[in-house]
A protein has these predicted regions:
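Alpha-helical interface subdomain recognition
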Residues: 2-91, 100, 113-118, 125-130, ...
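Short glycine/proline-enriched turns and hinge-like loops at secondary-structure junctions
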Residues: 74-75, 145-147, 171-175, 189-192, ...
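Short Gly/Pro-enriched turn/cap motifs at secondary-structure boundaries
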Residues: 100, 126, 141-144, 168-171, ...
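Helix-loop "lid/cap" segments that line or gate small-molecule binding pockets
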Residues: 104-113
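A short, Trp-centered hydrophobic/proline-enriched beta-strand micro-motif
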Residues: 129-137, 181
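Flexible, small-/acidic-enriched active-site or ligand-binding loops
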Residues: 148, 201-232
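A short core secondary-structure module
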Residues: 158-159, 163-207
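A short, charged helix-loop
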Residues: 224-249
Length: 391
Protein backbone atom coordinates (compact mmCIF):
# COMPACT_ATOMS: atom_id res chain seq x y z
CA UNK A 1 0.00 0.00 0.00
CA UNK A 2 1.37 3.43 -0.94
CA UNK A 3 1.91 5.87 1.94
CA UNK A 4 -0.79 8.47 2.49
CA UNK A 5 0.37 12.04 1.67
CA UNK A 6 1.30 13.78 4.90
CA UNK A 7 -0.63 16.71 6.28
CA UNK A 8 -0.90 15.93 9.96
CA UNK A 9 -0.98 12.75 11.99
CA UNK A 10 -3.58 13.50 14.65
CA UNK A 11 -7.03 14.91 13.99
CA UNK A 12 -7.53 18.31 15.58
CA UNK A 13 -10.67 18.46 17.69
CA UNK A 14 -10.88 22.12 18.72
CA UNK A 15 -12.54 23.40 15.53
CA UNK A 16 -16.20 23.15 14.51
CA UNK A 17 -17.79 23.44 11.07
CA UNK A 18 -18.12 27.22 11.33
CA UNK A 19 -14.38 27.45 11.95
CA UNK A 20 -13.64 25.37 8.86
CA UNK A 21 -15.81 27.69 6.75
CA UNK A 22 -14.05 30.69 8.25
CA UNK A 23 -10.68 29.13 7.43
CA UNK A 24 -11.66 28.77 3.79
CA UNK A 25 -12.71 32.43 3.72
CA UNK A 26 -9.35 33.50 5.13
CA UNK A 27 -7.52 31.32 2.61
CA UNK A 28 -9.48 32.89 -0.26
CA UNK A 29 -8.80 36.37 1.11
CA UNK A 30 -5.05 35.72 1.21
CA UNK A 31 -5.07 34.39 -2.34
CA UNK A 32 -6.98 37.44 -3.56
CA UNK A 33 -5.55 40.32 -1.49
CA UNK A 34 -2.09 39.20 -0.38
CA UNK A 35 -0.54 36.89 -2.97
CA UNK A 36 -0.56 39.42 -5.85
CA UNK A 37 1.04 42.12 -3.67
CA UNK A 38 3.43 40.27 -1.39
CA UNK A 39 6.62 40.65 -3.43
CA UNK A 40 6.10 44.41 -3.63
CA UNK A 41 5.38 44.66 0.09
CA UNK A 42 8.42 42.54 0.86
CA UNK A 43 10.56 44.90 -1.23
CA UNK A 44 9.00 48.09 0.19
CA UNK A 45 9.14 46.95 3.82
CA UNK A 46 5.48 47.73 4.46
CA UNK A 47 2.02 46.55 3.44
CA UNK A 48 -0.58 48.82 1.89
CA UNK A 49 -3.07 50.29 4.35
CA UNK A 50 -5.76 48.87 2.09
CA UNK A 51 -4.88 45.40 3.39
CA UNK A 52 -6.40 46.42 6.73
CA UNK A 53 -9.55 47.92 5.23
CA UNK A 54 -9.97 44.84 3.05
CA UNK A 55 -9.57 42.62 6.12
CA UNK A 56 -12.06 44.77 7.99
CA UNK A 57 -14.53 44.54 5.13
CA UNK A 58 -14.18 40.76 5.14
CA UNK A 59 -14.92 40.59 8.87
CA UNK A 60 -11.42 39.58 9.91
CA UNK A 61 -10.75 42.53 12.25
CA UNK A 62 -12.25 43.09 15.69
CA UNK A 63 -13.83 39.65 15.82
CA UNK A 64 -14.24 39.98 19.58
CA UNK A 65 -15.57 43.56 19.49
CA UNK A 66 -19.31 44.16 19.98
CA UNK A 67 -21.40 44.18 16.82
CA UNK A 68 -22.61 47.73 17.55
CA UNK A 69 -19.07 48.93 16.81
CA UNK A 70 -18.68 46.84 13.66
CA UNK A 71 -17.06 43.83 15.31
CA UNK A 72 -17.97 40.19 15.15
CA UNK A 73 -19.31 39.99 18.69
CA UNK A 74 -17.64 36.61 19.18
CA UNK A 75 -15.11 35.93 21.92
CA UNK A 76 -13.40 32.87 20.50
CA UNK A 77 -9.64 32.80 19.99
CA UNK A 78 -10.01 29.94 17.51
CA UNK A 79 -10.92 32.50 14.85
CA UNK A 80 -7.76 34.48 15.63
CA UNK A 81 -5.82 31.23 15.46
CA UNK A 82 -7.14 30.46 11.98
CA UNK A 83 -6.09 33.86 10.61
CA UNK A 84 -2.64 33.43 12.13
CA UNK A 85 -2.22 29.88 10.81
CA UNK A 86 -3.40 30.62 7.29
CA UNK A 87 -0.94 33.48 6.85
CA UNK A 88 1.83 31.12 7.99
CA UNK A 89 0.69 28.31 5.69
CA UNK A 90 0.56 30.70 2.74
CA UNK A 91 4.21 31.68 3.07
CA UNK A 92 3.16 35.32 3.42
CA UNK A 93 3.35 35.51 7.23
CA UNK A 94 5.12 38.91 7.40
CA UNK A 95 2.19 40.59 5.67
CA UNK A 96 -0.22 39.16 8.25
CA UNK A 97 1.78 40.07 11.35
CA UNK A 98 0.23 43.53 11.51
CA UNK A 99 -3.26 42.05 11.41
CA UNK A 100 -2.55 39.54 14.18
CA UNK A 101 -0.99 42.30 16.30
CA UNK A 102 -4.07 44.47 15.65
CA UNK A 103 -6.45 41.64 16.65
CA UNK A 104 -4.59 39.56 19.21
CA UNK A 105 -2.43 42.10 21.02
CA UNK A 106 -3.93 45.59 20.74
CA UNK A 107 -7.68 44.98 20.58
CA UNK A 108 -7.98 43.51 24.11
CA UNK A 109 -6.77 46.82 25.59
CA UNK A 110 -9.38 48.76 23.63
CA UNK A 111 -12.10 46.37 24.78
CA UNK A 112 -11.29 46.00 28.47
CA UNK A 113 -9.84 49.38 29.45
CA UNK A 114 -11.80 51.92 27.43
CA UNK A 115 -14.64 54.15 28.56
CA UNK A 116 -17.85 54.27 26.54
CA UNK A 117 -16.67 57.49 24.88
CA UNK A 118 -13.34 55.90 23.94
CA UNK A 119 -15.13 52.88 22.50
CA UNK A 120 -17.29 55.14 20.35
CA UNK A 121 -14.23 57.05 19.13
CA UNK A 122 -11.95 54.15 18.33
CA UNK A 123 -13.64 50.76 17.97
CA UNK A 124 -15.52 51.39 14.69
CA UNK A 125 -12.28 52.38 12.94
CA UNK A 126 -10.36 49.50 14.51
CA UNK A 127 -12.95 47.02 13.25
CA UNK A 128 -13.13 48.54 9.76
CA UNK A 129 -9.36 48.76 9.38
CA UNK A 130 -9.43 52.53 8.96
CA UNK A 131 -7.62 52.88 12.30
CA UNK A 132 -4.51 50.69 12.51
CA UNK A 133 -3.17 49.97 15.98
CA UNK A 134 0.23 49.40 17.58
CA UNK A 135 1.59 49.03 21.08
CA UNK A 136 4.81 50.69 22.20
CA UNK A 137 6.63 49.22 25.18
CA UNK A 138 10.29 48.73 24.24
CA UNK A 139 12.71 51.65 24.52
CA UNK A 140 16.25 52.11 23.23
CA UNK A 141 18.49 50.38 25.74
CA UNK A 142 15.54 48.92 27.65
CA UNK A 143 14.34 45.51 26.52
CA UNK A 144 12.73 43.09 28.95
CA UNK A 145 13.08 45.41 31.97
CA UNK A 146 9.94 47.43 31.29
CA UNK A 147 9.88 49.00 34.74
CA UNK A 148 13.08 50.88 33.86
CA UNK A 149 11.44 52.75 30.99
CA UNK A 150 11.93 56.50 30.93
CA UNK A 151 9.19 57.74 28.58
CA UNK A 152 7.14 60.06 30.77
CA UNK A 153 3.62 61.47 30.66
CA UNK A 154 3.20 64.35 33.10
CA UNK A 155 -0.28 65.71 33.74
CA UNK A 156 -0.77 69.34 32.75
CA UNK A 157 -4.38 70.45 33.03
CA UNK A 158 -6.52 68.40 30.66
CA UNK A 159 -3.48 66.95 28.90
CA UNK A 160 -0.47 64.74 29.46
CA UNK A 161 2.85 66.00 28.17
CA UNK A 162 4.73 63.00 26.79
CA UNK A 163 8.51 62.85 26.30
CA UNK A 164 10.63 59.87 25.34
CA UNK A 165 11.27 57.32 22.62
CA UNK A 166 10.19 53.79 21.72
CA UNK A 167 11.77 51.34 19.31
CA UNK A 168 11.06 48.07 17.46
CA UNK A 169 7.37 49.01 17.18
CA UNK A 170 5.39 46.69 14.91
CA UNK A 171 2.94 48.64 12.70
CA UNK A 172 4.97 51.68 13.70
CA UNK A 173 4.68 53.42 10.33
CA UNK A 174 1.09 52.51 9.50
CA UNK A 175 -0.38 52.91 12.99
CA UNK A 176 -3.05 55.52 13.68
CA UNK A 177 -3.50 54.62 17.36
CA UNK A 178 -0.48 53.71 19.46
CA UNK A 179 -0.89 52.33 22.97
CA UNK A 180 2.16 53.79 24.69
CA UNK A 181 3.53 52.56 28.01
CA UNK A 182 4.59 55.64 29.97
CA UNK A 183 5.65 56.70 33.43
CA UNK A 184 3.04 59.00 34.95
CA UNK A 185 5.06 58.85 38.17
CA UNK A 186 8.76 58.71 37.23
CA UNK A 187 9.72 58.08 40.87
CA UNK A 188 7.97 54.70 40.88
CA UNK A 189 8.84 51.58 38.90
CA UNK A 190 5.92 49.24 38.24
CA UNK A 191 3.38 51.38 40.09
CA UNK A 192 4.39 54.44 38.10
CA UNK A 193 3.45 52.94 34.73
CA UNK A 194 0.33 53.87 32.78
CA UNK A 195 -1.04 53.31 29.29
CA UNK A 196 -2.08 56.15 27.01
CA UNK A 197 -3.27 56.19 23.40
CA UNK A 198 -1.37 58.60 21.16
CA UNK A 199 -3.03 59.32 17.84
CA UNK A 200 -1.58 59.98 14.41
CA UNK A 201 -1.03 63.70 13.89
CA UNK A 202 -0.46 64.56 17.55
CA UNK A 203 1.96 67.54 17.66
CA UNK A 204 5.30 66.39 19.06
CA UNK A 205 4.79 62.77 17.95
CA UNK A 206 7.19 61.75 15.19
CA UNK A 207 8.11 58.45 13.57
CA UNK A 208 11.65 57.48 12.78
CA UNK A 209 12.76 55.34 9.90
CA UNK A 210 11.22 52.05 8.93
CA UNK A 211 13.86 49.76 10.43
CA UNK A 212 15.70 47.32 8.17
CA UNK A 213 15.33 43.87 9.69
CA UNK A 214 16.90 40.49 9.00
CA UNK A 215 13.47 39.03 8.24
CA UNK A 216 9.76 39.92 8.25
CA UNK A 217 10.51 42.41 5.50
CA UNK A 218 6.88 43.15 4.61
CA UNK A 219 6.15 44.26 8.18
CA UNK A 220 6.82 47.89 9.10
CA UNK A 221 8.81 48.27 12.30
CA UNK A 222 9.67 51.76 13.49
CA UNK A 223 11.14 54.07 16.09
CA UNK A 224 8.73 56.52 17.72
CA UNK A 225 9.70 59.86 19.27
CA UNK A 226 7.72 62.08 21.63
CA UNK A 227 8.85 65.65 22.28
CA UNK A 228 6.46 67.60 24.52
CA UNK A 229 3.62 65.77 22.81
CA UNK A 230 0.35 66.98 24.32
CA UNK A 231 -2.09 64.10 24.61
CA UNK A 232 -5.62 64.56 25.99
CA UNK A 233 -6.10 63.05 29.43
CA UNK A 234 -9.20 61.44 27.88
CA UNK A 235 -6.80 59.13 26.02
CA UNK A 236 -5.62 57.41 29.21
CA UNK A 237 -6.44 53.68 29.22
CA UNK A 238 -7.64 52.60 32.62
CA UNK A 239 -6.30 54.58 35.55
CA UNK A 240 -2.88 55.98 36.39
CA UNK A 241 -0.40 53.53 37.83
CA UNK A 242 -2.13 50.39 36.54
CA UNK A 243 -0.28 50.08 33.23
CA UNK A 244 2.10 47.32 34.25
CA UNK A 245 -0.71 45.19 35.66
CA UNK A 246 -2.68 45.55 32.43
CA UNK A 247 0.36 44.56 30.36
CA UNK A 248 0.81 41.45 32.49
CA UNK A 249 -2.89 40.59 32.08
CA UNK A 250 -2.71 40.78 28.29
CA UNK A 251 0.69 39.23 27.62
CA UNK A 252 -0.52 35.59 27.80
CA UNK A 253 -2.74 36.07 24.73
CA UNK A 254 0.08 37.81 22.87
CA UNK A 255 2.47 34.98 23.68
CA UNK A 256 -0.05 32.34 22.68
CA UNK A 257 -0.56 34.16 19.38
CA UNK A 258 3.18 33.98 18.72
CA UNK A 259 3.11 30.28 19.59
CA UNK A 260 0.33 29.71 17.07
CA UNK A 261 2.36 31.35 14.33
CA UNK A 262 5.44 29.34 15.33
CA UNK A 263 3.79 25.93 15.10
CA UNK A 264 2.00 26.81 11.86
CA UNK A 265 5.28 28.01 10.34
CA UNK A 266 7.04 24.83 11.46
CA UNK A 267 4.30 22.66 9.94
CA UNK A 268 4.46 24.54 6.66
CA UNK A 269 8.26 24.25 6.59
CA UNK A 270 7.81 20.49 6.95
CA UNK A 271 5.34 20.44 4.04
CA UNK A 272 7.72 22.35 1.77
CA UNK A 273 10.58 20.06 2.75
CA UNK A 274 8.63 16.86 2.19
CA UNK A 275 7.76 18.06 -1.30
CA UNK A 276 11.35 19.07 -2.03
CA UNK A 277 13.00 15.91 -0.70
CA UNK A 278 10.64 13.66 -2.65
CA UNK A 279 11.22 15.59 -5.88
CA UNK A 280 14.98 16.16 -5.57
CA UNK A 281 17.17 13.22 -6.52
CA UNK A 282 20.75 12.40 -5.58
CA UNK A 283 22.71 9.24 -6.32
CA UNK A 284 19.81 7.97 -8.38
CA UNK A 285 17.03 8.29 -5.83
CA UNK A 286 14.91 10.92 -4.02
CA UNK A 287 16.81 12.34 -1.07
CA UNK A 288 13.77 11.54 1.08
CA UNK A 289 14.75 7.87 0.71
CA UNK A 290 17.98 8.28 2.64
CA UNK A 291 17.85 7.17 6.24
CA UNK A 292 19.17 10.47 7.56
CA UNK A 293 16.45 12.39 5.72
CA UNK A 294 13.77 10.05 7.03
CA UNK A 295 15.00 10.35 10.59
CA UNK A 296 15.15 14.15 10.46
CA UNK A 297 11.68 14.38 8.90
CA UNK A 298 10.31 11.91 11.46
CA UNK A 299 11.69 14.00 14.32
CA UNK A 300 10.22 17.18 12.88
CA UNK A 301 6.79 15.62 12.28
CA UNK A 302 6.70 14.21 15.81
CA UNK A 303 7.65 17.47 17.51
CA UNK A 304 5.22 19.53 15.46
CA UNK A 305 2.38 17.18 16.41
CA UNK A 306 3.31 17.37 20.10
CA UNK A 307 3.52 21.16 19.99
CA UNK A 308 0.18 21.52 18.24
CA UNK A 309 -1.63 19.35 20.77
CA UNK A 310 -0.28 21.43 23.66
CA UNK A 311 -1.07 24.64 21.81
CA UNK A 312 -4.66 23.55 21.17
CA UNK A 313 -5.08 22.88 24.88
CA UNK A 314 -3.78 26.38 25.61
CA UNK A 315 -6.29 27.84 23.12
CA UNK A 316 -9.11 26.04 24.91
CA UNK A 317 -7.80 27.32 28.24
CA UNK A 318 -7.67 30.89 26.94
CA UNK A 319 -11.26 30.66 25.70
CA UNK A 320 -12.27 29.47 29.16
CA UNK A 321 -10.27 32.27 30.85
CA UNK A 322 -8.06 29.61 32.44
CA UNK A 323 -4.73 30.13 30.65
CA UNK A 324 -2.07 31.06 33.19
CA UNK A 325 0.93 33.31 32.70
CA UNK A 326 3.19 30.29 33.18
CA UNK A 327 1.36 28.13 30.63
CA UNK A 328 1.52 30.93 28.06
CA UNK A 329 5.24 31.27 28.75
CA UNK A 330 5.70 27.53 28.22
CA UNK A 331 3.83 27.70 24.92
CA UNK A 332 5.77 30.73 23.75
CA UNK A 333 9.30 29.56 24.42
CA UNK A 334 8.87 25.92 23.42
CA UNK A 335 7.06 26.53 20.14
CA UNK A 336 9.34 29.32 18.96
CA UNK A 337 12.49 27.37 19.77
CA UNK A 338 10.91 24.44 17.91
CA UNK A 339 10.26 26.67 14.91
CA UNK A 340 13.91 27.70 14.81
CA UNK A 341 15.09 24.07 14.98
CA UNK A 342 12.64 22.94 12.33
CA UNK A 343 13.41 25.61 9.74
CA UNK A 344 17.14 25.11 10.28
CA UNK A 345 16.81 21.37 9.65
CA UNK A 346 14.60 22.01 6.64
CA UNK A 347 17.11 24.42 5.12
CA UNK A 348 19.78 21.73 5.55
CA UNK A 349 17.64 19.20 3.70
CA UNK A 350 17.18 21.68 0.86
CA UNK A 351 20.95 22.00 0.53
CA UNK A 352 22.19 25.06 -1.34
CA UNK A 353 18.71 25.83 -2.64
CA UNK A 354 17.59 26.36 0.94
CA UNK A 355 19.81 29.43 1.06
CA UNK A 356 18.15 31.02 -1.99
CA UNK A 357 15.42 33.55 -1.24
CA UNK A 358 13.39 32.35 -4.21
CA UNK A 359 12.63 29.27 -2.10
CA UNK A 360 10.05 29.84 0.66
CA UNK A 361 12.10 27.87 3.18
CA UNK A 362 14.83 30.53 3.03
CA UNK A 363 12.36 33.26 3.92
CA UNK A 364 10.92 31.07 6.65
CA UNK A 365 14.44 30.74 8.05
CA UNK A 366 15.08 34.48 8.34
CA UNK A 367 11.56 35.20 9.57
CA UNK A 368 11.86 32.65 12.38
CA UNK A 369 14.80 34.19 14.20
CA UNK A 370 12.88 36.99 15.90
CA UNK A 371 10.26 34.65 17.33
CA UNK A 372 12.31 33.74 20.41
CA UNK A 373 12.98 37.43 21.10
CA UNK A 374 9.86 39.58 20.73
CA UNK A 375 6.87 39.10 22.98
CA UNK A 376 9.27 37.98 25.72
CA UNK A 377 12.59 36.24 25.19
CA UNK A 378 13.05 32.54 25.79
CA UNK A 379 15.16 33.39 28.81
CA UNK A 380 12.44 35.56 30.35
CA UNK A 381 9.84 32.86 29.65
CA UNK A 382 11.94 30.30 31.51
CA UNK A 383 12.42 32.75 34.37
CA UNK A 384 8.64 33.21 34.65
CA UNK A 385 8.11 29.46 34.71
CA UNK A 386 11.00 28.77 37.06
CA UNK A 387 9.83 31.31 39.65
CA UNK A 388 6.45 29.58 39.82
CA UNK A 389 7.83 26.12 40.57
CA UNK A 390 7.62 25.09 44.21
CA UNK A 391 7.98 21.74 45.97
Amino acid sequence: MAPVPYDRCMRRTIFAEEHDLFRQSVRTFIEREVAPNFERWDHDGIVDRTLFTAAGGAGFLGIEAPEQFGGGGVKDFRYNTIINEEFAYSGFAPSGLGITLHNDVCLPYFLSLTTEDQKQRWLPGICSGELITAIAMTEPGIGSDLASMSTSAIRDGDDYVVNGAKTFITNGINADLVIVAVKTDPKERHKGMSLIVIERGTPGFERGRNLEKVGLHAQDTAELFFTDARVPAANLLGSEGTGFAHLVDNLPQERLSIGVSAVAAARQALRWTLEYTHDRTAFGQPIANFQNSRFVLAEIATEVEIAEVFLDRCIEALNANELTVEEAAMAKWWTTELQKRVVDSCVQLHGGYGYMLEYPIARAYIDARIQTIYGGTTEIMKEIIGRSLRP
